[in-house]
């Protein structure tokens, strides 16, 4: 459905901000898709993060939902909940599902802001 060249372009960061005027946090995007964003170093609600592998791309939704693809593992994951959480980005519950998927695939750590194998 989607060629390798297009997947490669979808995986590359096309834009990063120190402050996104809509989300009010630092963000990273690739052709309209969100990339891994590590804002754990910020305090309070500004610490909203979405920790994926470097090649992964997708988007979070209000209340904690997420959908993404990870070309290097041939994995895709979608999560919606029956009760919205607080905030605009991925919440702890959603991130824990992402973390479990990467750990099951043998990835070791997301300490550097992206899942690393």
What are these regions (language model features)?
Residues 1-117:
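Catalytic loop of the DD-peptidase/beta-lactamase superfamily, centered on the K-T-G motif
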